[in-house]
Design a protein with these regions (language model features):
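Membrane-embedded transmembrane alpha-helical bundles that form the catalytic cores
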Residues: 1-323
Length: 323
């Protein structure tokens, strides 16, 4: 299901918002269950097979978090195992066939490609699984409540394309009593942000996508000017599609009294590559800085390690590309 589909806008979204606040009036945990159920419906709509790997991921990571929580002494090896499993599965789904293609080209072999179906949103929920496990190991979470965990990982506004939010921040908001009641200001702001994101997606991104699709279809007859326009249109398609989706996610969350971080800050106004990096997919940059760049030493270990750490973060951002 997509945010810009009629079924979501006219049925799933209003019903979820209504049931969420009604359920909170009965008992707070019921509101969380509404989010979990709505998220499962949203994710599995038309592709129920996607739930299999997501379910396996949930079992592995929540089980790992419980094991880590029960150990009184912090152990890096216990933490490393679920991280290795998460990253390994992510690389398997996204890059195995890419690796096979390069091996075949380099060695002149003909190893068969694997029939791999990429789970929707795997990059986003995998990285947030890592964030949850790390937060548990560092003692940032007071408890590892199963309902809170599921509501965090499955939260449908961010499940497929982000933005990424820290588990401590999200779970804290989810449990604040004042956020469980309808806030008309947040509702109005949420509708506004969602509408702007919808316009970005439907009127701008999809229009450029049509032009890009036509250009690729007729690429053999394309002139130099056509190719230049293709590059330009594609950059706008990517930005407005991703930015529009993120805006819609932020808008939906505002309706539910949850604050998600803004993900883009006019990146095409950047005056340098470094400035662009800071403006594009902001939540991912913060995640990679916190969980990769700083633990590796950041810029504290000399110029060579600074460049190496930056390169590792760059590849981390590349792995996240296309969800």
């Amino acid at each position: 299901m997509q945010f810009n589909s009629y079924g979501f806008i006219l049925f799933v979204l209003p019903v979820t918002v209504l049931l969420y606040f009604l359920a909170n009036k009965i008992k707070p945990v019921f509101g969380k269950l509404v989010i979990i159920i709505a998220s499962i419906i949203f994710y599995s709509w038309g592709r129920i097979n996607m739930l299999l790997y997501l379910g396996i991921s949930l079992l592995i990571n929540y089980g790992s978090a419980l094991v880590i929580k029960k150990r009184k002494i912090r152990n890096r090896m216990v933490l490393a195992l679920p991280i290795i499993v998460n990253v390994g599965m992510l690389v398997y789904f996204k890059y195995l066939n890419f690796a096979i293609s390069n091996i075949n080209a380099f060695l002149g072999k003909n190893f068969p490609f694997q029939n791999i179906i990429l789970p929707l949103g795997i990059s986003f929920y995998t990285f947030q699984q890592i964030a949850y496990v790390v937060a548990t190991e560092q003692g940032e979470l007071e408890n590892n409540d199963l309902i809170d965990y599921l509501a965090y990982i499955l939260y449908f506004p961010k499940l497929v394309m982000g933005p990424i939010i820290d588990p401590v921040d999200y779970i804290s908001q989810l449990n604040q009593a004042e956020r469980k009641k309808v806030d008309l200001t947040n509702l109005a702001v949420g509708i506004k942000i969602f509408s702007l994101g919808l316009l970005k997606k439907v009127l701008i991104a999809d229009t450029f996508a049509t032009a890009v699709s036509w250009a690729y279809t007729n690429i053999d007859a394309a002139t130099s000017m056509d190719c230049l326009l293709l590059v330009l249109f594609y950059t706008f398609e990517i930005y407005f599609d991703f930015s529009g989706y993120s805006d819609m996610a932020v808008g939906i969350s505002s309706m539910l009294n949850i604050d998600l971080p803004m993900n883009f800050d006019s990146p095409y106004k950047a005056v340098s590559i470094r400035d662009f990096w800071k403006r594009w997919h902001i939540s991912l940059t913060k995640f990679l800085t916190k969980y990769i760049y700083i633990p590796l030493g950041g810029s504290r270990k000399g110029e060579a390690f600074t460049y190496l750490n930056t390169l590792i973060v760059f590849f981390g951002k590349r792995i996240m590309a296309r969800g």
